[in-house]
């Protein structure tokens, strides 16, 4: 029994040792194959020798083909994001991948490898274009977690150099139609020191592309598209090839509609409420008028905070100013009405009383003594004295006339198409004139103000949105 157990133990131990040896052999083979695929030692040596040979007599201070022909730079730009756009500072922010391709015959090499992909450590060892962004205020390259730069060298000497940049570029906004304005914000770049005789920039086919706009921070703008141009700019240092990308932006009106337009319209409508308040309610109408004027002043100040201090009138300035004039005119309407209402003619009761109970000492200078029966009274049948005047079959006593009556009869106020009293309406001097009753000014205003404001809005919105 014991020899059998010993034999079984020896058999199991032998099988275990053999299987372990097979696993180790397979692991060594796989690891050696993986190492050979990723970075063969012979290829590492080959690349190192190629780079050392290329840079041995290379002068990075000299551009390719110097003294022979201009260096041609092919440009590609991938727009990662745009925004935000600042109307106050007249600038916008853009995040791009900027790629430049050129040929340097000094970097040709013979090898089984057609492309050498290198990191940013190689950038400072070869010549690269001195490209600048002409309208940039600030610009920075990305360095996290490593410098965002790529360098590729083909065996025929072609070089691709890309880097990621965030640029705050200047954009001169024309705000005449603000907030219904559209803009073309440029990104301008060129060589800093090489004129067109030494360096030429070219756009490649489909050279400008844009990423998904969902991550863009445009906020108040819609991206309408882009276009690129090439031009020659003449300076005192020479003629330079200048490349420009225009980003077409259209402003969204939602924010300004809620913030400015709707409050202004409601304030103007609120000022019309005074036309339906009794004209003798002076405190109520005055308080309403002053409140709406102060509200419009506040709204105009707030509207200007989102704009730079431009010297011309914008579309929003025009709208706010007209709304302010409507509100101010509503207040002045009541001031006019209140002034002429205070010059009101004496009431009918007072006139009737004056006629029925006149002061005999004023209009009957003396009594006539005649003999008459006791059941009869004697009356003076002479014409009325000069102190009494007649106008439109109505009798007025001159001593009861106030200043307004005198001015109206004199034609001083009536020549301006306004009447103090209804009797001014039919005088001989009124022939061919339009009668406007100043006491009915509220009735006229209830129609005139809404109609004129509606016409203004019609012209304003059609003119700025469709013309």
Curated annotation (Swiss-Prot):
Asked if the Swiss-Prot or TrEMBL record annotates the protein with the keyword Cell membrane, the reply is: yes
Q: List the disulfide bonds.
A: 171-185
Q: Which residues lie on this side of the membrane: Cytoplasmic?
A: 278-283, 333-446
Q: How does the protein associate with the membrane?
A: Multi-pass membrane protein
Q: Which residues form the signal peptide?
A: 1-17
Q: Where in the cell is it found?
A: Postsynaptic cell membrane; Cell membrane
Which PROSITE patterns does the UniProt entry name for this protein?
Answer: NEUROTR_ION_CHANNEL
Please give the GO cellular component terms listed in this UniProt entry.
chloride channel complex; dendrite membrane; GABA-A receptor complex; GABA-ergic synapse; microtubule cytoskeleton; nucleolus; plasma membrane; postsynapse
Q: Which UniProt keywords apply?
A: Cell membrane, Chloride, Chloride channel, Disulfide bond, Glycoprotein, Ion channel, Ion transport, Lipoprotein, Membrane, Palmitate, Postsynaptic cell membrane, Signal, Synapse, Transmembrane, Transmembrane helix, Transport
Question: Is the keyword Disulfide bond in the record?
Answer: yes
Tissue and organ distribution: Expressed in brain.
Q: Where are the transmembrane segments?
A: 257-277, 284-303, 312-332, 447-467
Query: Which family is it part of?
Result: Belongs to the ligand-gated ion channel (TC 1.A.9) family. Gamma-aminobutyric acid receptor (TC 1.A.9.5) subfamily. GABRG3 sub-subfamily.
**Domain commentary:** GABAARs subunits share a common topological structure: a peptide sequence made up of a long extracellular N-terminal, four transmembrane domains, intracellular or cytoplasmic domain located between the third and the fourth transmembrane domains.
PANTHER family in the cross-refs = NEUROTRANSMITTER GATED ION CHANNEL (PTHR18945)
Q: How does it assemble?
A: Heteropentamer, formed by a combination of alpha (GABRA1-6), beta (GABRB1-3), gamma (GABRG1-3), delta (GABRD), epsilon (GABRE), rho (GABRR1-3), pi (GABRP) and theta (GABRQ) chains, each subunit exhibiting distinct physiological and pharmacological properties.
Protein name (database record): Gamma-aminobutyric acid receptor subunit gamma-3
Origin organism is Homo sapiens (Human)
> What gene does the UniProt entry assign to this protein?
GABRG3
């Amino acid at each position: 029994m014991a020899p059998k157990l010993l034999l079984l133990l020896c058999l199991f131990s032998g099988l275990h040792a053999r299987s372990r040896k097979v696993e180790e052999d397979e692991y060594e083979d796989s690891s050696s194959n993986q190492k050979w695929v990723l970075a063969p030692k012979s290829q590492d040596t080959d690349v190192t020798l190629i780079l050392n040979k290329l840079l041995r007599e290379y002068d990075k201070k000299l551009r390719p083909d110097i003294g022979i022909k201009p260096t041609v730079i092919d440009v590609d730009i991938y727009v990662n994001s745009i925004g935000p756009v600042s109307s106050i500072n007249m600038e916008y922010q853009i995040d791009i991948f900027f790629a430049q391709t050129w040929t340097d015959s000094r970097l040709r090499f013979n090898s089984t490898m057609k492309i050498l992909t290198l990191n940013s450590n190689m950038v400072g060892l070869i010549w690269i274009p001195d490209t600048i962004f002409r309208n940039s205020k600030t610009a920075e390259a990305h360095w996290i977690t490593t410098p965002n730069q790529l360098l590729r060298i083909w065996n025929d000497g072609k070089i691709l150099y890309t880097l990621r940049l965030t640029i705050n570029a200047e954009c001169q906004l024309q705000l005449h139609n603000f907030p219904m304005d559209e803009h073309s914000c440029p990104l301008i770049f060129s060589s800093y020191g090489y004129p067109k005789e030494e360096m030429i920039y070219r756009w490649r086919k489909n050279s400008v592309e844009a990423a998904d706009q969902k991550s863009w921070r445009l906020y108040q703008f819609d991206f309408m598209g882009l276009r690129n141009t090439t031009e020659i700019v003449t300076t005192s240092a020479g003629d330079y090839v200048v490349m420009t990308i225009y980003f077409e932006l259209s402003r969204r009106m939602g924010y300004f509609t809620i913030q400015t337009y709707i409050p202004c319209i409601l304030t103007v409508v609120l000022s019309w409420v005074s036309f339906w308040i009794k004209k003798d309610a002076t405190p109520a109408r005055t308080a309403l008028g002053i409140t709406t004027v102060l509200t419009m002043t506040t709204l105009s100040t707030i509207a200007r905070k989102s704009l730079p201090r431009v010297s011309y009138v914008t579309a929003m300035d025009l709208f706010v100013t007209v709304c302010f004039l409507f509100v101010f005119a509503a207040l002045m309407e009541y001031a006019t009405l209140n002034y002429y209402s205070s010059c009101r003619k004496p009431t009918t009761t007072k006139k009737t009383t004056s006629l029925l109970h006149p002061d005999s000492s004023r209009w009957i200078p003396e009594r006539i003594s005649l003999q008459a029966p006791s059941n009869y009274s004697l009356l003076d049948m002479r014409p009325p004295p000069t102190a009494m005047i007649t106008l439109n079959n109505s009798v007025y006593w001159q001593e009861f006339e106030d200043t307004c009556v005198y001015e109206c009869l004199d034609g001083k106020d009536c020549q301006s198409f306004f009447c103090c009293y209804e009797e001014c309406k039919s005088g001989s001097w009124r022939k061919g004139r339009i009668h406007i009753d100043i006491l009915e000014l509220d009735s006229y205003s209830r129609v005139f103000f809404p109609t004129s404001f509606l016409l203004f809005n019609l012209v304003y919105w059609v003119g700025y949105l469709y013309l």
